[in-house]
UniProtKB/Swiss-Prot annotation:
Disulfide feature: 24-29
InterPro entries: Bacteriocin_IIa (IPR002633), Bacteriocin_IIa_CS (IPR023384), Bacteriocin_IIa_dom_sf (IPR023388)
GO cellular component: extracellular region
Propeptide boundaries: 1-15
Pfam families xrefs: Bacteriocin_II (PF01721)
Main localization (coarse): secreted
Keywords attached to this entry: Antibiotic, Antimicrobial, Bacteriocin, Disulfide bond, Secreted
Domain of life, per lineage: Bacteria
Gene of this entry: entHF
Gene3D superfamilies for this protein: 1.20.5.130
Localization in the cell: Secreted
Species of the source: Enterococcus faecium (Streptococcus faecium)
Record-given protein name: Enterocin-HF
Family the entry assigns: Belongs to the bacteriocin class IIA/YGNGV family.
């Protein structure tokens, strides 16, 4: 893997990362299960400790 500079990153044309382990591009979507499982675990713990109101407005 190669680390890109800010200038190099600004020239990258690609897909979208949704922040939950899912990323999509023109060819389709993929899941980084390591990230997804960690996020699911964190969300489950937060919802258990807040009675299901973690991060929700209203």
């Amino acid at each position: 893997m190669e680390k890109l500079t800010v200038k190099e990153m600004s020239q990258v044309v690609g897909g979208k990362y949704y922040g939950n382990g899912v990323s999509c591009n023109k060819k389709g979507c993929s899941v980084d299960w390591g990230k997804a499982i960690g996020i699911i675990g964190n969300n489950a713990a937060a919802n258990l400790t807040t009675g299901g109101k973690a991060g929700w407005k209203g």
